[in-house]
């Protein structure tokens, strides 16, 4: 009896765990299936496939001209794919006109009507859709409160700040309650301090509204600070997608590694393997170790982020460390951190980034011979294949 009872309880527990895991999976909001696009004989997008879950803040990151804005315009309906399909909540919308797509869009210049008040700018969409005026007023009042624009409802665009204009554009884009909001570099025209503040505001508003955000930017810091998921584009193709931490810590190509922040690339030849520990000879610059299975005598590139490196001290370390020496050739102060450049014996440049509090502990100057340390576990390789 006890054995039967135990088995029954165990089965119930497994069913409960299974149900919970299923319910925690967010439903899919947007799916791009093998999207390709050319303008004349110039390919702009090449076989793009993306899946974005409901409530996600997804960022398309890439250099100017990589196709990210074209992809956004395609989802909105301003461009048509040459090949592939677009789905929202399981419904194909590839051939739907702009006005029938359940999306909102914020343009780079916000496109506010200068002759209309804040209230009337926000009301444009629902009035076009012939929504009753009391319902329009109710929705606008709710959005004015969320965006902290209550005192500006009767103001005109030329009389409000850039940050306030951005919030008006957001309210106008979401008043028709779209399934997904598309944002085409809406912060790029703002000064750096305001841009940082509005990034935080946008994230908070997205959490409040619960709308899926698809955000286009060429700014790495902006992408990583705002996104729950992101992808990096180059020349019309996706190089890698995942969480910001995944892409930063586990890049799958040298392009992604270099695109997301600074990085040191160490070129050498595999000298020895002991278990999963590999020794890489850097020629005149010395040797380092990293954890990977690589064939001996093979040419190999390894990478380490500047913030994972520090200057030698007598402090003991509880993990295997690498050590390199060189001449300090530059020191650049950036407020909260300091960047150093060290010339190694083979002439290559090695970058170090220290938080200000750590940097002031080192009394070093240009021209000094210095020694740097970094953990074996912080060195990674990239298999481009």
Residues covered by each model-derived region:
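ABC ATPase nucleotide-binding domain helices that frame the ATP-binding cleft
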Residues: 69-72, 168
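Glycine/charge-rich catalytic "coupling/switch" loops of P-loop NTPases
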Residues: 284-331, 357-385
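Conserved coupling/switch loops of ABC nucleotide-binding domains, chiefly the family-specific signature
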Residues: 82-85, 135, 235, 267
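Helix-to-loop junction immediately C-terminal to a conserved catalytic motif
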Residues: 76
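Conserved ABC transporter NBD signature motif
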Residues: 84-92
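ABC ATPase nucleotide-binding domains
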Residues: 98-104, 108, 112-258
């Amino acid at each position: 009896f006890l054995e039967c009872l135990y088995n029954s309880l165990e089965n119930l527990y497994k069913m409960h765990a299974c149900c919970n895991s299923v319910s925690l999976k967010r439903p899919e909001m947007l799916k791009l299936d093998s999207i390709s696009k050319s303008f004349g004989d110039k390919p702009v997008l090449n076989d793009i496939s993306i899946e974005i879950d409901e409530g996600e803040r997804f960022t398309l990151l890439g250099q100017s001209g990589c196709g990210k804005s074209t992809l956004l315009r395609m989802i909105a309906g301003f461009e048509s794919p040459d090949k592939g399909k677009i789905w929202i909540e399981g419904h194909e919308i590839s051939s739907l006109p702009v006005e029938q797509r359940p999306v909102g869009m914020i343009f780079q210049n916000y496109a506010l009507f200068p002759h209309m008040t804040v209230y009337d700018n926000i009301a444009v969409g629902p009035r076009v859709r012939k929504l009753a005026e009391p319902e329009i007023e109710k929705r606008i009042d709710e959005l004015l409160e969320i965006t902290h624009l209550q005192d500006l409802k009767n103001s005109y665009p030329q009389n409000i700040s850039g940050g306030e204009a951005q919030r008006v554009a957001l309210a106008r884009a979401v008043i028709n309650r779209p399934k997904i909001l598309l944002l085409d570099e809406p912060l790029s025209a703002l000064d750096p301090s305001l841009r940082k503040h509005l990034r935080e505001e946008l994230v908070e508003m997205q959490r409040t509204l619960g709308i899926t955000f698809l955000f286009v930017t060429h700014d790495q810091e902006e992408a990583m600070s705002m996104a729950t998921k992101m992808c990096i584009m180059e020349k019309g193709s996706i190089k890698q997608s995942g969480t910001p931490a995944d892409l930063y810590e586990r890049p799958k190509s040298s392009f992604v590694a270099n695109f997301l922040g600074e990085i040191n690339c160490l070129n050498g030849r595999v000298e020895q393997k002991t278990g999963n520990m590999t020794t890489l000879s850097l020629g005149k610059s010395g040797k380092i170790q990293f954890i990977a299975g690589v064939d001996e005598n093979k040419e190999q590139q390894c990478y380490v982020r500047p913030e994972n490196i520090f200057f030698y001290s007598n402090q003991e370390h509880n993990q295997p460390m690498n050590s390199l020496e060189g001449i300090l050739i530059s020191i650049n102060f950036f407020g909260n951190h300091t960047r150093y450049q060290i010339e190694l014996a083979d002439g290559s440049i090695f970058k170090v980034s220290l938080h200000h509090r750590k940097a002031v502990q080192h009394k070093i100057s240009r021209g000094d011979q210095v020694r740097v340390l970094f953990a074996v576990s912080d060195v990674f390789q990239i298999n481009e294949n």
